[in-house]
Regions:
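PLP-dependent enzyme catalytic core of the Aspartate aminotransferase-like
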Residues: 81, 333, 342-352, 357-391
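Conserved PLP-anchoring active-site segment centered on the Schiff-base-forming lysine
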Residues: 113-135
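A short helix->loop->beta-strand "cap" motif at the edges of active sites that frequently abuts
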Residues: 119, 140, 198-201, 229-230
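Helix C-cap/helix->beta junction micro-motif
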Residues: 27-30, 138, 198-199, 313, ...
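N-terminal small-domain helix-loop-helix segment of the aminotransferase-like
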Residues: 2-102, 109, 284-287, 389-391
Length: 391
């Protein structure tokens, strides 16, 4: 008997990621030293304090039973203290915070917990792939909200059709943005909350990159906006802020009803995050509150080095104000996929085609600053040398 996957699987994700992996494998098999600037996985280790906390916690026999699906009260209390410290936002650890196995866990399951098949949700294009994939899994109709350079990659909310705004259960946005590296100011979030209240719409904000901002810019939480908890939830992750991507720990905050819906779903799916990892998460948040631990300066230097080197080669890219990514407009005459493939085959550098994140991403590539400065300079040199051969 031949076993095949469900029809849903054929609608999931982009084949582009698989293509890029195949290209990389082929080039590496030829003995090429490939510099991978594709996947946004931090290359830095957690702080010594976090590693010490993990080491101590894994030696504690009490941490090897099933954890609670909503996360330990101690971790949720630490999140509440950190939100107060970082954003000036008060949260109830009991009803307004839910621990997650990484933000992707929550993002993948949110539509299942809030929507019924046939409902609609608004997601950005370009956007992080799980945003649309989660709707496919839940049988929810997506409305793709275009984010374009002429509007600084901010949505034009008034352009959303009235019937879409009326039908949609939620609108999902992400600032600072992956893949766009775009940012949004307080005025935008105030307008977004007003819009959501007008249309009885839940706002889902993905704030994974709040601690990775440059040039003095400090991203805000949407929950800072007056009345936001009536209509908004916010995802946050320890993956990028504290170099804990492999630990799989994050949290959802905000509207108690939405938090409880996801909590109810997850209580039927999993037993939550390993207790030792939650202990390390507490240590990470406490260290940040005590010493303002930040990785932003590392990525700011990498951004400066890489963009300057590419500029010398004639590829001018606007410097992003946040995230570990560069959303780079490509030279004329190429598609995103063509230039990504040729860059790998001729320069040995992996980047992700912009259309991997939606049709609106055509004309761009995403570059992840996940190599040390010397490797980034080498990547820029290789790209520049290759581009000069095309002149």
């Amino acid at each position: 008997m031949k076993i095949t996957g469900s029809k849903r699987l054929s609608q999931l994700g982009s084949a582009i990621f698989s293509e890029v992996a195949d290209w990389k494998r082929e080039v590496m098999n030829q003995g090429v030293d490939v510099i991978d600037l594709g996947i946004g996985s931090p290359d830095l280790p957690p702080s010594d304090r976090i590693i010490e906390a993990i080491t101590e916690a894994v030696r504690n026999p009490a941490h090897y039973g099933y954890p609670t699906s909503e996360g330990s009260l101690a971790f949720r209390e630490a999140v509440a203290r950190w939100y107060r410290y970082r954003f000036g936002v008060e949260l109830s650890p009991e009803s307004e915070i839910l621990t997650l196995m990484g933000s992707q866990d929550g993002l993948a399951h949110l539509a299942l917990s809030l929507c019924d098949p046939g409902d609609m949700a608004i997601v950005p294009d370009p956007g992080y792939p799980i945003y649309s994939a989660s709707l496919v899994l839940a049988g929810v109709e997506p409305y793709l909200l275009p984010l374009r350079a002429e509007h600084n990659f901010l949505p034009q909310l008034e352009d959303i059709p009235v019937d879409v705004a009326a039908k949609a259960k939620f609108i999902l946005l992400n600032y600072p943005s992956n893949p766009l590296s775009a940012v949004a100011d307080r005025a935008f979030f105030e307008h977004l909350i007003t819009y959501a209240k007008k249309h009885d719409l839940l706002v889902v904000h993905d704030l994974a990159y709040s601690e990775m901002a440059f040039d003095g810019y400090r991203p805000i939480s949407i929950l800072e906006i007056e009345g936001a908890k009536e209509v908004a939830v916010e995802f946050h992750s320890l993956s990028k802020s504290f170099n804990m991507a492999g630990c799989r720990i994050a949290f959802l905050t905000g509207n108690a009803g939405a938090v409880n819906a996801l909590k109810t779903l997850k209580s039927n799916i999993d037993y939550g995050v390993f207790s030792a990892i939650q202990a390390a998460g507490i240590a990470a948040l406490e260290e940040d509150m005590a010493h303002n631990h930040s990785v932003a300066h590392v990525y700011e230097r990498r951004r400066n080095v890489f963009i300057s080197a590419l500029a010398e080669a004639g590829w001018i890219i606007p410097p992003p104000k946040a995230t570990m990514f560069i959303w780079a407009p490509i030279p004329k005459g190429w598609t995103s996929r063509q230039i990504s493939r040729e860059m790998l085959y001729h320069a040995g550098v992996v980047v992700i085609p912009g259309d991997a994140f939606g049709a609106e991403g055509e004309g761009f590539v995403r570059i992840a600053l996940v190599q040390e400065e010397g490797r980034l300079l080498e990547a820029a040199k290789r790209i520049g040398d290759w581009l000069r051969t095309l002149e």
